[in-house]
Amino acid sequence: MKNISRSFWLSGALFALVASASAQIVEFRATINAAQEVPTNPSAATGSAIMIYDVASNTFDLVVSISNFPATLASSHIHEGASGVNGPVVTNFGGEAVYTRNGSTLTATFRGVTHGGTKLTLLKNGAYVNFHSSAFPGGEVRGQLIAQPKRLVANFTVAQEQAAFPAATLTGNTNAFGAAVMTYDSGTNVVNLRISLYNFPNTLTNSHFHEGAPGVSGAVVQNLGAGTVVNYARDGNSITGTFLNLTYGGDPVKLLTGGAYLNFHSNVFAGGECRGQVIASEELPGTRVANVSTRGFVGTGSQVLIGGFNITGSEPVRMLITAKGPSLSTYGVTGVLANPTLTIFDGSGRQMAQNDDVGTPAAGTELATIYGVPTSTLESALIVVLPPGNYTAIVAGSGGTFGIALLEATDLRNNATILSNRAAGATGAEGDVLAEFKRDLRAAATNLRWAAAKPTGRPEPELCVGVPLGVQAPAALAQAQAR
């Protein structure tokens, strides 16, 4: 029970720390035991520590819990040293007096502590917490501080490029835009990066990470390559890029504190057609809308299935958007759309991306591993990084096909609330339109309104809350009417 209690205590303390933290933070975790001491000792004490480190201010909050530690705590510190190596003290916490004791368990929370060591050493997992007692003055238990991957984001615009090159004639001559999401592990210096570029008809001649503040042209620190490298894929005027396990060539501190940007060069704009400052995500743990979907009839011509959603805040979101038809027959749906196509538009009506037939995803690709990708080769799917804004996804029938289709949008992030609003409809189609979702949402039936005057002969809309396809319904379902 002691370990369970410590886990709950650490979780609660972590939430309190994160809730007040700035964006430029890196989380560190440490498993504390005697086996990491040099030399090791027979102490049975074990524990955990969580640090929230603000890279910009060089300050941190730390929560610690150690059990089976009956001896008086003589002192505690952060030392600089790699795993298996003893190093000098850089930050002092104090002894027993600054901890709370409950039997043989010690706990403490330290806030706003200035780190006495070097930023880069800490970020590269080169520091550890050490707890000393009279029995083991060199340290009874210690734990290496391991950096957790940090989420970074970037929104690409022409305006950011224009600010760095005032004499250039970018604005009005290109409408390129896009976004990127990435994780950076400072301990291993590895970046996992995903890019989406839209309205980019020109040839992508090169792309890089640069170091520089907003509005400043800086040096290249990491080359990503031209649009011809295998990491990029073009479909019309949209380009997607995936770079996994990339060793970062720049300064980790600058990357984590807004001092780097992504730049995309073209044959028309050699200095860069659009760019985006890389910033640390401000995302906090919270409820996530995992999936929203709309099921309805798709006819010919203008009889399409429409889904709308809105991404709020300042950060882009990586999403899987799919159009399914043939696979619905597995769940007993009849008259399915045999060959659905999928197109995404932004709030200005600009076409961003399109897919007709996902085919058979190649082994090892993301489409082959992500849950929710269509199982029929004739269905459609797009994995995109979308900047904040309003979006519309449209499902149509290829080759004059018609029938029932399912439009789904899935958030591929962890711990995020992003879909603040969504709308669905089917133009020119009679019958029901089904909107589906996963996770906690509320439907206020009294707030449902016709966008314009209700068409003559149309029945009043009715809202029913049910269960997904293939799931047995509970004994009772909530049902409400909107009048």
Regions found by a protein language model. Give the residues of each.
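A sequence-level detector for low-complexity, Ser/Thr- and acidic-rich stretches
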Residues: 38, 157-179, 281-439, 443, ...
